[in-house]
Amino acid sequence: MIENSDYMELSFKKPSKNVREAMCQASLDLGNREIETAHKRNAEESLKDLTHHQHARIVNSGNSAIMIAMSNIKGPVLLPDQGVWAGFKKIAEFLGLKIEYLPTNQGIIDLEILDNYIKITTPESLFITSFAGYMAEQPVKEIFELCDRRGVILVEDASGSIGDPQKNLACGDHAHIIVASTGSPKIINLGNGGFISTNDPEIFKKSNYILKSSRISPVICAGMVEAIKKAPYSLSKTLQACNFLKKEIGTVLFEEYRGINVTLPSENPKQMGRELRKRIPVEGGGMISTCPRYDRIKQPAVCLEIKNLDIKCLKKDNLREISDITNNITSNYFI
C-alpha cells in the first residue's frame, strides 16, 4: 500500500541510514586487510544471491561494468534504437566494435523483429536495459531465450530493476551477463560504484586488467551489503508509485507496463518541463527530464523520474498532488 502524508515534500534519493552507517563503520576499518577483504567478499556473495549468477564483481561504476562486458566481445554489438543507456554506444565506439541498431516500438523490443535482425546482422551480443527508457518493462526472459538459441550474448543493464520481486528482471536465469550502476539515484543507491555478474568465469579472466583498474573501496562494498537488503522494497515502492500515477494522470505512455518513471507525450516538452520543475521542486535534485533523447524515447515527451525520489517521499498524498499539478499543467501540451 502507498502511505499517506500531510503535505508534499520531495527529496532526491540518497543512501539510506543503514547504508550510511555501514559505510561509516567501514571507513574506520580502512587499513585492516582482513576486514576490507571480508566487506568485498560479503558484497559479492550478496550480489550472487540477488542475481542468481555464480560469479560477481564490484567495480567503480556502471560504465566500468559495461566496459568489462564489452571487452570480451569482438562484435558486432546489437543495440535498441532507443530507450537504452547512451554509454553502450560510447563504449562500443571506444573499443572499436561495430554497432547495429535494432528497430523497436518506442524502445520495446519485438521478438519477431529481433529474430530477423539477428539473422541479418549476426551480432555477437545484445545490450538492453531492463526497462526501456526506465518507462516500460522489456520481455527479458523471452529475449534471453531467443538470444540463447541464436548464440547471442544477452547483457542486461539492471540498474533500475535490481531486486525485482517477480524475478523477471535482473535475474541470472534470463541474462548471460548483468551489469548495473549503484550510483545515485539507482535502486541500489550508494552514490558510487557498480557491478557485473555472470555464470561464465572466463569473462573476468579475460578482463583482469580492467577489473584491477576498476577496483572499488571496501567502504562501498560494506554499504552494498546493506543496500541489497532493501533493493526489493525500494523497487516495489517505486513501481507502485508509478502505477498509481499512471492511473491518476490523464494521458501517459506505457500505462499497462511496469516502469520506474512516468512518461507524458507533449507538443512542447521544454516549456512543459520548465513549468513542472517550478511546481514540483525536489530538494537536492530534480525529477523532470525531456525528450526526444536516446536513453528515454525518441519523440517529444516529458518524463516524471519517480526513480529519483527518496522512497520516503512516495506517499499517497504526495503522489496525488504530483498528479493534480501534472494534469493541470499538461492539458495544454498533450499531443
What is each residue range found by the language model?
Residues 77, 204, 268-277, 311-322:
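Short, conserved charged micro-motifs
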Residues 173-207, 218-221:
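Active-site PLP attachment segment
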Residues 239-243, 253-280, 288-302:
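Conserved glycine-rich beta-strand-loop-beta hairpin in the small C-terminal domain of fold type I
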Residues 2-64, 82-90, 167, 231, ...:
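Conserved N-terminal alpha-helix of the aminotransferase class I/II PLP-enzyme fold
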